[in-house]
Amino acid sequence: MSLVIDFFDETEEVKEEYVNMIRELLEKAAQMEGVEDGTELSVTFVDNERIREINRDYRGKDQPTDVISFALEDMGEGEVEIIGADMPRMLGDLIISIPRTKEQAEEYGHSFDRELGFLALHGFLHLLGYDHMTEEDEKEMFGKQKEILGAFGLRR
């Protein structure tokens, strides 16, 4: 099982060990979810100001948030799916706020790496099509998160 993950650290604060942890966690999630080898995504670490801009411009919410997912497989009205014969599956992009990650880790009383892993996995599951808009969907998605984090050994 092998994902192709491009990491971008606009904050220049994220240690290599955290990048490696996220890579391994998302590989585990991909394996458990049956994601094809060679599937691509990007993970970008930003500050609160940058994620606030993205949240405002794309979601109409003028405030910082912890993680935003841009799923390339979400089809809008009138869009046509283009599938190339030998093209890898492209899931999309994850944007994670490092300051919010630190704040939430402290707020929830667990480690920075646990919160960072949780946010990366949460965003990854959104890229795979999971959501939490209804109680039923939330139960399914949060159950998946707990199962994968547990299998990976990243507990509260």
UniProtKB/Swiss-Prot annotation:
GO MF term list: metalloendopeptidase activity; RNA endonuclease activity; zinc ion binding
InterPro entries: MetalPrtase_cat_dom_sf_prd, YbeY, YbeY_CS
Cofactor field: Zn(2+)
Localization: Cytoplasm
GO cellular component, one term: cytoplasm
Protein keywords: Cytoplasm, Endonuclease, Hydrolase, Metal-binding, Nuclease, Ribosome biogenesis, rRNA processing, Zinc
Enzyme class: hydrolase
Cofactor binding, note field: Binds 1 zinc ion.
EC number(s) stated in the UniProt entry for this protein: 3.1.-.-
GO biological process, one term: rRNA processing
Binding site for Zn(2+): 122, 126, 132
The protein's role, per its UniProt record: Single strand-specific metallo-endoribonuclease involved in late-stage 70S ribosome quality control and in maturation of the 3' terminus of the 16S rRNA.
Family indicated by similarity: Belongs to the endoribonuclease YbeY family.
Protein name: Endoribonuclease YbeY
Source organism of this protein record: Bacillus cytotoxicus (strain DSM 22905 / CIP 110041 / 391-98 / NVH 391-98)
